[in-house]
Curated annotation (Swiss-Prot):
GO terms for cellular component: extracellular region. It comes from the Eukaryota. One of its GO terms (molecular function) is peptidase inhibitor activity. It is found in: Secreted. Keywords: Hypotensive agent, Metalloenzyme inhibitor, Metalloprotease inhibitor, Protease inhibitor, Secreted. Expressed by the venom gland. This is Bradykinin-potentiating peptide 5. It comes from Bothrops neuwiedi (Neuwied's lancehead). GO terms for biological process: regulation of blood pressure. This peptide both inhibits the activity of the angiotensin-converting enzyme (ACE) and enhances the action of bradykinin by inhibiting the peptidases that inactivate it. It acts as an indirect hypotensive agent. The keyword Secreted applies. The keyword Secreted applies.
Length: 11
């Protein structure tokens, strides 16, 4: 998982 903006969407 990577942090970001917007945050990653977990499917």
């Amino acid at each position: 998982e990577e942090g970001g903006s917007p945050p990653p969407v977990v499917i």
